[in-house]
Amino acid sequence: MTKVCPEIEGTLSLSVVPVSVDVSFASDHFPTYKLGPDNQIVEEPKEDEKGPSVKETVEKESELLSDQHKRLSVRDLASKFDKNLAAAVSLANEAKLREVASLEGHVMLKKLRDALEYMRGRTDGQNKQDVETAISMVEALAVKLTQNEGELIQEKFEVKKLGNFLKQTSEDAKKLVNQEKSFSCAEIETARAVVLRLGEAFEEQERISEASRAQGPDVEKLVEEVQEARQIKRMHHPTKVMGMQHELHGLRNRIQEKYMNSVKLHKEIAIIKRVEESKSCPFVLEGKQSLGSCLRIRVNAQDNAPDLSNCSIQWYRAACETSRREAISGAIQSMYAPEPFDVGRILQADILSNGQKFTVTTDDPVDPDSGLPSRVESLMRKSNSEFSVVISQMNGQDYASRSHVFTVGKTRIKLSRGWITKARELYSTSMQLCGVRGNIKAPTKAVFWQPRKSLTFILTFESEHERNAAIALARKYAFDCSVTLLGPDD
């Protein structure tokens, strides 16, 4: 029986690829790896790893920078940016060193893989499997190294970006520092100028106060003299003023007396003149010359007296005897009842008889009714004022009627009886209202009213006072509506 023993080589002669002496490693020993699922090589964590990674450091610094940005002053911010810029430069240098180490790792892994490939071709059996396993681990290390290089490139890009940002921010901070410095210098100069001006003003004030203290006695003397002069003026001035006031009062009294004497003389002359004329005038004017009364023309001569009914009569009103007269349209009868428009005026009547003209005149202007203004004021407090009237004529024809209500409003006049309205018109230029001027009973209580063209009324009031109040009130309301409410041709 033959026993076969396999030949086992005691030593394998391998050609080792030389490694460059310039290669630098991150550590002094080979890292520890283990196989994970699907034959993936997983690097075991290093227990002696010192400090965080570059990415964590950059993130931490960025967070601190963003948190403290609002709280730092401009100068502190610039100093912080300078420190961070230096840290970013050091991190960039460290990344460059790691990039060089990564490149050397690739070279070393390439050489190691080539050596393992060479050994795989020279071995068989279990050793060959171990070599193939080692080759797989080397390839996995190469992939891991490539991934680390990608992360390193990304970190390098972020570090470079952060460095540029910090550099630009540092320059901006320096500009802000310089700008604030210039502003501060300008404010300091302004404050210094203000302080100088205040100092000059205080010095000027002090000089003025010293000068005033030096001139104190003279000023006190002047003040005493002024006070004495004022006292003398107060003692003598009122007496002089009172004397002048007494003189003016005496002059006014004398002028008033002379005026009254002149008016009295004019009246006496007018009376004498009218008496002389009345001796030759067969007519005379009688009646109270005031509002609410009635003036009548009477025949004065007894022998050869003309018949008044055969005479032509026309009444006039004038401001005075010598002024221009205004004919009263429709006043052609022997009697005439003055209305509020005649107050303060002289009334005259021309009488034409047998070709001769005679004139009768009131002695004085027509006197007003003392209670009329207060009555009108009380009525104006109401929105409408109502008066009881009787229609004597309508459109020139006699009209027998019962009592009606004559309503004078702020914008219109209405004549009604109960629910029946005879006339209702707004104030207009076609409306007329005045005392009656024709031959009618009780002319002192009657008015002529034309609401519109082709419609006229003769209305009789309960009293002379009511008649005059209605006329005055209606004219005031019409004047407020920019309408002049008078009689025909007034």
UniProtKB/Swiss-Prot annotation:
One of its GO terms (cellular component) is cytoplasm. It comes from the Eukaryota. InterPro entries: SCAB, SCAB-ABD, SCAB-Ig, SCAB-PH, SCAB_CC. Expressed in roots, stems, leaves, siliques and flowers. Keywords: Actin-binding, Cytoplasm, Cytoskeleton. GO terms for biological process: actin filament organization; circadian rhythm; regulation of stomatal movement. It is found in: Cytoplasm, Cytoskeleton. Pfam families: SCAB-ABD (PF16711), SCAB-Ig (PF16709), SCAB-PH (PF17684), SCAB_CC (PF16712). GO terms for molecular function: actin binding. Probable plant-specific actin binding protein that bundles and stabilizes microfilaments (MFs). This is Stomatal closure-related actin-binding protein 3.
